Amino acid sequence: MGEILDGKKLARELGEKLGSEVDSLKEHGVSPKLCVINIGDDPASKVYVASKKRKAEKLGIKQVVYQLPADESEEDVLKLIDSLNADPEVSSLMVQLPVPPQINADRVIERIDPEKDVDCLTPANIGRLWQGKHFVEPATAAGIIALLDHYQIDLTGKNAVIVGRSNIVGKPLAALMLERNASVSILHSRSRNLADLTKQADILVCAVGKAEMIKADMVKEGAVVIDVGINRVDGHLVGDVDFAPVKEKASWITPVPGGVGPLTVEFLMEEVIKLTRRQHGLD
C-alpha cells in the first residue's frame, strides 16, 4: 500500500521559510510586488486569483489584481503590460489564463518582460528552462520536484511518464525531470496504447483534468504516482487518478485534495521572491 506524499505539510514548511525571506528583503528596503491581470469572469480563475491574494497578504507580498472586463481589447491589455514592465516597483507579472477569444494569449504572454515572468511562459524563459539555465520555473512543476525531493525520491535513471502536455505542467515538468537525469516520456490524448506506456513508469504524473482516468491496471507495482488533476464529481474533489485502488499498488501517491494543489500557490510566491531578489542583485 502506498504512502502519502503530503503536499499540505510541505506547503506549511515552505510558507514559514518564505515569510522569513520576505522579511529579509524588506530589511534591504525591497518589497516584492506581484501584479495579476485577470480578464473576464471565469469562475476557476477568480478562485485561483483570490487564493494567491490571500497567500501574498499572509507573506507580506503586495499583490495587485487588474480585473478587466471580458470584452477588453488586446491593445489595451498590451498597453497595461507595457506599463507594468516599465514600473520598477513591479517585481513580477502574470496574465491569468484562459483569456477571452478576442485576445491572442501568445501575443499577450510574449509581451511580458522575461525578468518579471513569474509563470515562466515567455519564449525566452521556456528556452532557458530547456537549456537548464533558468532563473524561474512554473509553480506546479517546481512544486512537484520539491515534493519528490522532500521525500528523497531520486529521479536518476528512472522512467518518468507524464500524461499531459500543457505549457504550465507537462512540458516544464519534463524539462525539470530531465535535469534530474530521469528518462522522460510525455503522453497525451493522441497517444496510442496509453496503458501499456503508463505501466512502464517508475514515476507516473497525470495532469489532464479527466476524473479518475488512471486505473490500477495502468500502474506498475511500486510506482510513484503524482496526481495533478482537480475535478469535481458529485460535489467532491477528485484527481485524475482512481485513488484507492491505485494506492494499493503505488509506493507513494499524492492525494486530491492535499497533494500537489497546496504547493502551487506557495511556489508561485517563491518565484515572486526569486525574481525580486534577482532584480535587486540579492540572488
Swiss-Prot record:
<comment type="subunit">
    <text>Homodimer.</text>
</comment>
<keyword id="KW-0368">Histidine biosynthesis</keyword>
<keyword id="KW-0521">NADP</keyword>
<keyword id="KW-0560">Oxidoreductase</keyword>
<dbReference type="InterPro" id="IPR046346">
    <property type="entry name" value="Aminoacid_DH-like_N_sf"/>
</dbReference>
<protein>
    <recommendedName>
        <fullName>Bifunctional protein FolD</fullName>
        <ecNumber>1.5.1.5</ecNumber>
        <ecNumber>3.5.4.9</ecNumber>
    </recommendedName>
</protein>
<feature type="binding site">
    <location>
        <position position="230"/>
    </location>
    <ligand>
        <name>NADP(+)</name>
    </ligand>
</feature>
<dbReference type="GO" id="GO:0004488">
    <property type="term" value="F:methylenetetrahydrofolate dehydrogenase (NADP+) activity"/>
</dbReference>
<dbReference type="GO" id="GO:0009086">
    <property type="term" value="P:methionine biosynthetic process"/>
</dbReference>
<dbReference type="InterPro" id="IPR036291">
    <property type="entry name" value="NAD(P)-bd_dom_sf"/>
</dbReference>
<dbReference type="GO" id="GO:0035999">
    <property type="term" value="P:tetrahydrofolate interconversion"/>
</dbReference>
<dbReference type="GO" id="GO:0000105">
    <property type="term" value="P:L-histidine biosynthetic process"/>
</dbReference>
<dbReference type="Pfam" id="PF00763">
    <property type="entry name" value="THF_DHG_CYH"/>
</dbReference>
<dbReference type="Pfam" id="PF02882">
    <property type="entry name" value="THF_DHG_CYH_C"/>
</dbReference>
<keyword id="KW-0511">Multifunctional enzyme</keyword>
<dbReference type="InterPro" id="IPR020630">
    <property type="entry name" value="THF_DH/CycHdrlase_cat_dom"/>
</dbReference>
<keyword id="KW-0028">Amino-acid biosynthesis</keyword>
<feature type="binding site">
    <location>
        <position position="189"/>
    </location>
    <ligand>
        <name>NADP(+)</name>
    </ligand>
</feature>
<dbReference type="InterPro" id="IPR020867">
    <property type="entry name" value="THF_DH/CycHdrlase_CS"/>
</dbReference>
<keyword id="KW-0554">One-carbon metabolism</keyword>
<keyword id="KW-0658">Purine biosynthesis</keyword>
<keyword id="KW-0378">Hydrolase</keyword>
<dbReference type="GO" id="GO:0005829">
    <property type="term" value="C:cytosol"/>
</dbReference>
<dbReference type="InterPro" id="IPR020631">
    <property type="entry name" value="THF_DH/CycHdrlase_NAD-bd_dom"/>
</dbReference>
<dbReference type="GO" id="GO:0004477">
    <property type="term" value="F:methenyltetrahydrofolate cyclohydrolase activity"/>
</dbReference>
<dbReference type="GO" id="GO:0006164">
    <property type="term" value="P:purine nucleotide biosynthetic process"/>
</dbReference>
<comment type="function">
    <text>Catalyzes the oxidation of 5,10-methylenetetrahydrofolate to 5,10-methenyltetrahydrofolate and then the hydrolysis of 5,10-methenyltetrahydrofolate to 10-formyltetrahydrofolate.</text>
</comment>
<comment type="pathway">
    <text>One-carbon metabolism; tetrahydrofolate interconversion.</text>
</comment>
<comment type="similarity">
    <text>Belongs to the tetrahydrofolate dehydrogenase/cyclohydrolase family.</text>
</comment>
<dbReference type="InterPro" id="IPR000672">
    <property type="entry name" value="THF_DH/CycHdrlase"/>
</dbReference>
<keyword id="KW-0486">Methionine biosynthesis</keyword>
<feature type="binding site">
    <location>
        <begin position="164"/>
        <end position="166"/>
    </location>
    <ligand>
        <name>NADP(+)</name>
    </ligand>
</feature>
